[in-house]
Structure formats: structure tokens, C-alpha cells
Amino acid sequence: MSRAALDKDPRDVASMFDGVARRYDLTNTVLSLGQDRYWRRATRSALRIGPGDKVLDLAAGTAVSTVELAKSGAWCVAADFSVGMLAAGHERKVCKVAGDATRLPFADDVFDAVTISFGLRNVVDFSAALREMARVTRPGGRLVVCEFSTPVSALFATVYKEYLMRALPRVARAVSSNPEAYVYLAESIRAWPDQAALAQQMSRAGWSAVRWRNLTGGIVALHAGYKPQPV
């Protein structure tokens, strides 16, 4: 799978991530110029979690993001539909569950907070995933979506586009076990909704008080919202 069609086959996407699992974390750090660490810390801060909270880290991959969240003292579970990615993170001692974002294997209202980092783009029906995340979150609970987005400066956006389509695939060929997956990455980022459009989708899925904050000039955006209390 090398094209960012929005009717993604979940089996193809899972297989693609299985194929990059072994060197996934290293590749991400290289391609992001080390910014991935900053984005993970910012996500943890935006979730506003602490001891006693139950947190779902969806599309957690190798669970490197889950370990960051667990620094808050919260109980965190890593969920991903790529068994290969979860297996690659076997040394990270957090709870891991294989599951589809549109059919989560959890009861209603069980998590105090849910987050998904760089995974919503890869879900065949991301609106359904947003609704499913709301289902498993308690009323008043918080969602934070960390995802690639649209740079706020036109000049920066032009430079970034060139990096995505030209430099990124070349770097990926040097460090990744499956460079074709990063062609998909670049194209899926370009096809993804901008900050305002994603906020609107979150609101439509039932999340309230949705706001976003740009990171690294808008290359990444953190979108946050709450599950409404019952009336």
C-alpha cells in the first residue's frame, strides 16, 4: 500500500505497519529531527492526567507514547491494530491490547482520558473512531488528538511540502525497513483535513469544547475536547 486513498483497507494498513515495526521509533526520530519527543511530552501535558486516572493510548504502536503518558502516574493501556508494532514494543512494561479503533474491545465509560497520536489518518472511518473513543470515555473525560496538520506560514508550508514529497522518502530509504510506507505517510499527511476541519469533525462526533494548539509551526496540531456530561 503506497497511496493515501481515504478508503484505506484496514488489513493493508496493519500489514504496512507490521512491516516497519522493527525500526519504526528510530525512523520517526530521524524524520522528525527529534521533534517526536517534544510532541509526546506536549500530548501528555494536554491530557491533564495524573495518579488514579485510566488512560487509553490508541494507535500506540510500539508503546513509546504510552510510556511517556505513564510518567504522569496514570494507569495507561496501549492499543493498536498492528500486532507487529505491539510486539516490537515488548520491552515496554505497559498493558497492551490489539484492537480496531472503530470497534474497541472496552466497555462504555471506562477511561478518564483517551489519546491518539499520528494514527487517526490511518483509520478507514475516522469519524466512527472518534465516536468510538467517546463511547469508552467517561462523561467529562478528555480526548487529545496529536496529528500532522497544516503549517500556519505559507512559506513554511511550501518548504514543508517539498520535504514531504522529496526529502522524506529519500531519508526513509536510508533508515526504514519499508521505505514505501513513508511515501504513504507523506501523501496521507497532504490529504488530511486542516486544523479547523478536524475540530469540526470532532464536534460532530460528540466531543464538546474542541480546541487546538499548533506545534512546530503547525506541522503538528493537538486537538482537545471533552465528552459532555449527561443532561
Swiss-Prot record:
Catalytic reactions of this protein: a 2-demethylmenaquinol + S-adenosyl-L-methionine = a menaquinol + S-adenosyl-L-homocysteine + H(+)
Family annotation (NCBIfam families): MenG_MenH_UbiE, PRK00216.1-2
Residues that, per the record, bind S-adenosyl-L-methionine: T62, D80, D100, A101, S117
Pathway in which the depicted protein is active: Quinol/quinone metabolism; menaquinone biosynthesis; menaquinol from 1,4-dihydroxy-2-naphthoate: step 2/2
Keywords of this entry: Menaquinone biosynthesis, Methyltransferase, S-adenosyl-L-methionine, Transferase
PANTHER family listed in its UniProt record: 2-METHOXY-6-POLYPRENYL-1,4-BENZOQUINOL METHYLASE, MITOCHONDRIAL, METHYLTRANSFERASE
Top-tier EC class: transferase
Gene label: menG
Protein name as annotated: Demethylmenaquinone methyltransferase
Assigned EC number: 2.1.1.163
Organism: Mycobacterium marinum (strain ATCC BAA-535 / M)
Top-level taxon of origin: Bacteria
Family to which the UniProt record says this protein belongs: Belongs to the class I-like SAM-binding methyltransferase superfamily. MenG/UbiE family.
Family matches, as SUPFAM superfamilies: S-adenosyl-L-methionine-dependent methyltransferases
Coiled-coil segments: none
Keyword Transferase: yes
Role of this protein: Methyltransferase required for the conversion of demethylmenaquinol (DMKH2) to menaquinol (MKH2).
Transmembrane segments: none
Gene Ontology biological process terms in this record: menaquinone biosynthetic process; methylation
GO MF entries: demethylmenaquinone methyltransferase activity
Protein's UniProt keywords contain S-adenosyl-L-methionine: yes
